[in-house]
C-alpha cells in the first residue's frame, strides 16, 4: 500500500510538473522586424572647419545684402574682429551694424508670417546651405506660433550668430 501511494504521488507530481513546464515554456515569440541598416550623419557633420574672420564677414554680408563686400570694408571689419578677444560680442555688433544699413535684403514680417514654411526653408538654405530637417521645421513652426512678436530680423540675427553658421 505504501508503494502504491508513492507511485500515485510520483505520477501526480510528474503531471503537475509537466503542466507547469508546458505552461511556462509556451510563449509567443516577440516579433522581429527587418530593419535596413543606414548610415546616419548629423545635419552638420561635414561642417568641421571654423570660418576665418574674413570668410565669416564676406559670407554674412553676402547673405544679408545679396552682394559682395568691398575689399576695403572687408579688411577694416576683419581687423576689428581680430583686435577684440570676445568674438561673439564683435559678431553681434557687426550684425547689428549690418542690419541698420540700407540695402539689407530681409523679408518683411508680414511676408514671413504669410508663408512660414517657405521662409524657414529659404533661411536654412541661405544661411546653412542645406535643407531643413522635418524636426527643425516642426520646431520652428511651433516656435513662431507661440512667439508672435519674433521678427524676420531677429531670425536672421539668430541664424548669423548660431554655432553652425560659424563652420563650413
Give residue spans per PLM region.
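Substrate/cofactor-recognition hotspot
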Residues: 27-168
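C-terminal motif of bacterial Sec signal peptides marking the signal peptidase cleavage site
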Residues: 22-25
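Sec-dependent signal peptide recognition
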Residues: 10-16
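N-terminal secretory signal peptides that target proteins for export/translocation
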Residues: 1-9
Amino acid at each position: 500500500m505504501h508503494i502504491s501511494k508513492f507511485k500515485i504521488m510520483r505520477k501526480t507530481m510528474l503531471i503537475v510538473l509537466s503542466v507547469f513546464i508546458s505552461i511556462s515554456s509556451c510563449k509567443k515569440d516577440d516579433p522581429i522586424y527587418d530593419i535596413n541598416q543606414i548610415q546616419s550623419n548629423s545635419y552638420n557633420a561635414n561642417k568641421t572647419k571654423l570660418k576665418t574672420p574674413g570668410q565669416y564677414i564676406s559670407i554674412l554680408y553676402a547673405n544679408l545684402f545679396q552682394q559682395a563686400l568691398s575689399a576695403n570694408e572687408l579688411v577694416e571689419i576683419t581687423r576689428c574682429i581680430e583686435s577684440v578677444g570676445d568674438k561673439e560680442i564683435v559678431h553681434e555688433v557687426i550684425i547689428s551694424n549690418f542690419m541698420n544699413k540700407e540695402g539689407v535684403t530681409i523679408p518683411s514680417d508680414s511676408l514671413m508670417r504669410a508663408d512660414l514654411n517657405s521662409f524657414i526653408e529659404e533661411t536654412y538654405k541661405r544661411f546653412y546651405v542645406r535643407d531643413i530637417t522635418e524636426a527643425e521645421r516642426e520646431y520652428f513652426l511651433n516656435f513662431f506660433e507661440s512667439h508672435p512678436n519674433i521678427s524676420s530680423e531677429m531670425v536672421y540675427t539668430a541664424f548669423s550668430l548660431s554655432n553652425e553658421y560659424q563652420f563650413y
